[in-house]
Amino acid sequence: MSDIITVTLPDGSQKQTARGTTIADFVRESIGPGLAKAALFARVNGQDMDLARKLDEDVKLQIFTPKSPESLELIRHDAAHVVASAVQKLFPGTQVTIGPATEEGFYYDFFREKPFTPEDLEKIEAEANAELKRDMAFVRTEISMDEAVRLFEEKGEKFKVEIVKDIAAKGAKTLTLYTHGDWVDFCLGPHAPSTGKIGIIKILSSSGAYWRGDHRNPMLQRVYGTAFFDKKQLAEYLTRIEESKKRDHRKLGKELDLFHFHPYSPGSAFWTPKGTTLYTTLSNWMRQLTQNDGYVEIKTPLMFNKGLWETSGHWGKYKENMFLVLDSESGEHDFSLKPMNCPSHHLFYGFKKHSYRDLPLRYHTQDVLHRNEAAGSLGGLTRVRQFAQDDAHIYCTEAQITDEVRRFVKLLDHVYKAVGLTYAVKLSTRPEQRLGDDSLWDRAEGGLKAALESLGLEYELAPGDGAFYGPKIDFAVSDSIGRRWQLGTMQLDYLAPERFDLTYVGEDNAEHRPVVLHRAIFGSFERFTAILIEHFAGAFPAWLAPIQAVLVTVADRQNDYARKVRDSLRAKGYRVEFDERGLSMNAKIREAQLQKVPFTLVVGDNEVSGEGVSPRRYGGEDLKTMKVTDFEALLAKEAALP
């Protein structure tokens, strides 16, 4: 074995170094001191690692610095460790549980008798930032599972002991520890070289959370926080958070009278007339788009016997997330409300024999689904128990994958652009544990790549993140204030056709397995509606607005004319109201602005005599007085489904 290994860098260049050289030393000696000083972690053959790890074989190496988008997640994980250390220093006897990084920060769950007060959170933040100034190294070690159990038992960390034993029960032989100062926790890593690499930590809030999300378990204290490389980034984030609070769909949903919730049916929305209009407009829009794109809409039952879920594999893995129904004949909970559409669509496909000439078959549905989400996880429309998806399943041949993916991405692109959402694409490829041989995965991944590249789309490659039954493409959108939301997906599935014995007759008159493509654009209607409420801050474009125009008269003598205009516009399908309340004109205009109605139509004597209206856009832009027919033409253009 040679003592020299080859390191391939992202630009394709190659460098040699001694076997056993640490990543940090390699960067400093072979690339330069500037990058070595800025480096936070590395990706080695697709696996993220600390800079202190050694290079023992030929590798592909990528270095991440504060300029890398991926680095924020790293320092937020670091910050979770630092905050946990600060809490245990300030509040002896507090036990630690878990503390992951999240999309925009991190949280850590603690067990203690008393909830944290606002004053406690201020102390925690101050101590955490003091630990950053001490610039303590993160040191990685590995110990046996027995040693890990003893370590955390000696520390009195019963929750950590429980987790370690669970990990050991799954076959793990060793556990990775990270220490900074005298505080230690276990995690997979990686971590930055030291606490000083974190610029600043901000504690945001605290709340209660049950251990492992189960109300039968102890209540924990969850501390939320975030971290950035400098104060400017933090200030921008806090400004965005304040704007987010103003746009919170739960707040706007109440102010704009769109939806309600009731404890008798947690996680299930009551849609008001205005909210129902918003919901059905999205529903009808998606229905029109899919029909125009060659989909057929189907409906399948709400409730199924467990046999379906045993065939699909969900009964053993997903049963706890289902609402189970008692079978009066067997006396057992053998039925459930469906939590997803896929298995029932596979049954539907199997009702008939199919030829290669029938494919691709594109089934679309908007059926209601139910998932037994933990009560503590429910939040407005973004996490619910009853919902509907713009769900579709495409049954096609392997040769049709690229064209079908391309077709789907074009539809998704149209939808997101129509509502002003930009998006990023991630392609997740084969995991270690997977179905099928490498040639199958080569073809599947190649088909997805070819589709994305033919459309000129940039995408992030996520090696190993695909499902065991096939690779997938995920689409994360960014809203008007820069927040990212995971929405669309396209997943290839080679397993379902096997489980459900799905076939088609090929040109050779032999039976073949189709490929199943699972895809969604909205995700759930409820969550997509929440995102749009916040994205538009409740000020929807005319085509989506529950009320597109409201008429306001200067005096009562114009009321008959206003009713005539309202009725005329309604007859043509527009959503128009006339505010007949006994308020002043200015009060009515102000109310229309508060309700974010796209057009307020002022009617006075001049408008009556001229058969016109004086439109005012939401936000205050006055348009010139125009004939009703001219306004109708304007509204027709802006109210048309995109």
From Swiss-Prot:
Disulfide bonds, paired cysteine numbers: none
Organism: Myxococcus xanthus (strain DK1622)
Function field: Catalyzes the attachment of threonine to tRNA(Thr) in a two-step reaction: L-threonine is first activated by ATP to form Thr-AMP and then transferred to the acceptor end of tRNA(Thr). Also edits incorrectly charged L-seryl-tRNA(Thr).
TGS domain boundaries: 1-65
Family affiliation: Belongs to the class-II aminoacyl-tRNA synthetase family.
Protein name per its UniProtKB record: Threonine--tRNA ligase
Alphabetical keyword list: Aminoacyl-tRNA synthetase, ATP-binding, Cytoplasm, Ligase, Metal-binding, Nucleotide-binding, Protein biosynthesis, RNA-binding, tRNA-binding, Zinc
SMART domains found in the cross-reference section: tRNA_SAD (SM00863)
Compartment list: Cytoplasm
